[in-house]
Amino acid sequence: MGLQRWFYRGGRPNLMARLLDRGTAALSARGGGPEYLVALEVPGRRSGRIISLPLVVATVGGERYLVSMLGEGVNWVRNVRAAGGEVALRHGRREEVHLQEVVAPDLRAPVLKAYLKRATNASAHVPIDKDAPLAEFERLAPRFPVFRMVPRNSA
């Protein structure tokens, strides 16, 4: 089993992954790392406290997207849905956005493909080659939530 899969065995981060995620989220929130690495800030659906975690932004056609490499059951996806998509992203500065879920698999597919090219660690969780034809991504797309970022003032 690869290290990336070990970190998220069972679809949930283990202690080491949580510590690394916390550090990476803090770094990206302060503007460290590449521009496409952001800290997502979303209220916990049970606790209400702000949860921060690092995510990779995929860009397609000038639009920005977030993808769940672990699929539907992860907490950040549940928290985003519970918050009605109202979240903040940080990379040096705080940006309030509305995350609009992309439902149609044919619209998710190009985003998923762009995401895999940028987030190389995601390939351990998304069972497809980043250079596969778009039709293969369409078959896989329903398993991976995709959210389009809309600036809050234009949502």
Provide a role label for each language-model segment:
Residues 24-25, 52-53, 133-135:
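A generic local structural motif
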Residues 9-13, 47-50, 83-84:
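Short hydrophobic/aromatic-rich motifs at helix boundaries and adjacent loops
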Residues 35-69:
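Short beta-strand segments
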Residues 71-152:
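Short, structured beta-strand-loop surface elements
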Residues 1-30:
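Extreme N-terminal tail/first-helix region
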Residues 33-37, 143-144:
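A short helix-loop-beta-strand connector motif used in the catalytic cores of GNAT acetyltransferases and
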